[in-house]
Swiss-Prot record:
This is ATP synthase subunit beta. It holds the Pfam family ATP-synt_ab. It is a peripheral membrane protein. It comes from Pseudomonas putida (strain W619). NCBIfam families: atpD. GO terms for molecular function: ATP binding; ATP hydrolysis activity; proton-transporting ATP synthase activity, rotational mechanism. F-type ATPases have 2 components, CF(1) - the catalytic core - and CF(0) - the membrane proton channel. CF(1) has five subunits: alpha(3), beta(3), gamma(1), delta(1), epsilon(1). CF(0) has three main subunits: a(1), b(2) and c(9-12). The alpha and beta chains form an alternating ring which encloses part of the gamma chain. CF(1) is attached to CF(0) by a central stalk formed by the gamma and epsilon chains, while a peripheral stalk is formed by the delta and b chains. ATP binds at residues 148-155. It catalyses: ATP + H2O + 4 H(+)(in) = ADP + phosphate + 5 H(+)(out). Keywords: ATP synthesis, ATP-binding, Cell inner membrane, Cell membrane, CF(1), Hydrogen ion transport, Ion transport, Membrane, Nucleotide-binding, Translocase, Transport. SMART domains: AAA. InterPro entries: AAA+_ATPase (IPR003593), ATP-synt_VA_C (IPR055190), ATP_synth_F1_bsu (IPR005722), ATPase_a/bsu_AS (IPR020003), ATPase_alpha/beta_chains (IPR050053), ATPase_F1/V1/A1_a/bsu_N (IPR004100), ATPase_F1/V1/A1_a/bsu_N_sf (IPR036121), ATPase_F1/V1/A1_a/bsu_nucl-bd (IPR000194).
Amino acid sequence: MSSGRIVQIIGAVIDVEFPRDGVPSVYNALKVEGAETTLEVQQQLGDGVVRTIAMGSTEGLKRGLNVIDSGAAISVPVGKATLGRIMDVLGNPIDEAGPIGEEERWGIHRDAPSFADQAGGNDLLETGIKVIDLVCPFAKGGKVGLFGGAGVGKTVNMMELIRNIAIEHSGYSVFAGVGERTREGNDFYHEMKDSNVLDKVALVYGQMNEPPGNRLRVALTGLTMAEKFRDEGNDVLLFVDNIYRYTLAGTEVSALLGRMPSAVGYQPTLAEEMGVLQERITSTKEGSITSIQAVYVPADDLTDPSPATTFAHLDATVVLSRDIASLGIYPAVDPLDSTSRQLDPNVIGNEHYETARGVQYVLQRYKELKDIIAILGMDELSESDKQLVSRARKIQRFLSQPFFVAEVFTGSPGKYVSLKDTIAGFSGILKGDYDHLPEQAFYMVGSIEEAVEKAKKL
């Protein structure tokens, strides 16, 4: 164990000088004597000086303080002891319920599974949310991104998915709160507690008031815990809210580490940092990790380097649209922009595929006709186009759905719609079976039977 001393502090970045024969390796964890702070080595600058990122506040630190090299990377508790607990980036409990009592700790920097160990699957994961199951179905062991600007419903959608999947799914889940609001983390904890699934969930939080070092590493902490469950042969769910903040934390420290910024001020290592995280989120022959990640889209611009880099790693992308939210249609998923590699007749079967493509065709055609309607009015359309517009408006409304987690706001009870009912409902609308019903009957209902019942009351 060599020891050194602090020679420079710039915000979250600290330079430490060690004897030349005892320079710590990159990613080693260092402890500051007399303070609770842990540092992680990022660069070796030469002459025995290393540049580190602080995993915690640097207030009260000063030059000359002694620093001890732990000789290993940051390690966190893994295994069953983490279930039902809330931890920080270093694996310390923050729920005031005593020590974790883990039997094993793993380092947070690990290699991705080799190509030979990886396993792919085509099994569908039913979410109970109509628009997602229809247009961008999730794969078991796949990676899903929820893309959306500020305030279009990423976290509410994430909570509903967690409720529907984690409660219906009997396995373990890990939730990593990366740079999000503490209130949301709190809501999530109580949601899990009330649903009696807390004993199957490990929670790791590095919220937005924490230093960038914590936000940069907390995703890896959560992922390490998920990998342990996977390697024990379980099917694990990994929820990350929000991947963008992980990128942003890297941006915050990048300039302080002395790197030249690249496009839009992001770190030059953006693609590599994202790849290191995403390549580890994968399924092996032992078990699977199904991950659902919220991705904040700055200024609603999907071509921003951060969301654009994330796109490449995903199996399904759920794009939330402000235009759809402004119509009062929730979940505000854009059925024309959202995609999934599962949307293939060989995987999901012809009926599902034809229905999904039919819905997209009708909505796309309606989008094209909107300009004509705005200028000339509905009367100028041909009979077939009038019929198509009427069906498109019904489909648009039928894509909305009351959520369980939003019952407190909406006052209407949540609905879980099975894939079979979803396909039956949309294919019925496309065939014209429900042309006689008013379009408001389709708004905020679960299955098509409920729309028929609602129409009787209108």
